[in-house]
């Protein structure tokens, strides 16, 4: 049986947040029948302290918890058991820990498991004027659709630029974002670039000073409703 880390909102202590050495972030959605189970796995042989905070689309904290995992122990939280469904209950979840974690994510829609993802890379702290890039695949071919979510996992303002290139490497879309603390933005590429035989390829995100993360939702082309991938590995 899975061990439940916490079954209620616990106020985060300032002391614990200050001692957190590892910072992770990923996407959740509790709107339109969706849910998320978060599996936190201690990758170390000693005790690992963890804290989690869930933010709505505007960056407001709506739920938080703290817990402790013994060496190599897993624990899980089902967000829908602690947070009500709401049109604004989507965006970024942040996890701070005293040592390394592996985070398994099980996404549900209408009670059915639709996607599994794993997050193991920390969200980096950038130096002033330091640039970073995230990149991923998108497709708008046939009945395929891609949406991306850009999220700020920090308590400070973050900015980034998103560029989309077609199959010939030509730029077909770009947008700049300024995100408040823990704020998220959702963009359907159908609205931004339409669809077509050459509308697939590279989605690039550049940032400076403060790091962001993205998630991508794929539908169509045989997907079982929805495929959700978090993009947290920075390529440069």
What are the roles of these predicted feature ranges?
Residues 19-236:
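Gly/Pro-rich, tryptophan- and cysteine-flecked surface segments typical
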Residues 4-15:
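Sec-dependent N-terminal signal peptides
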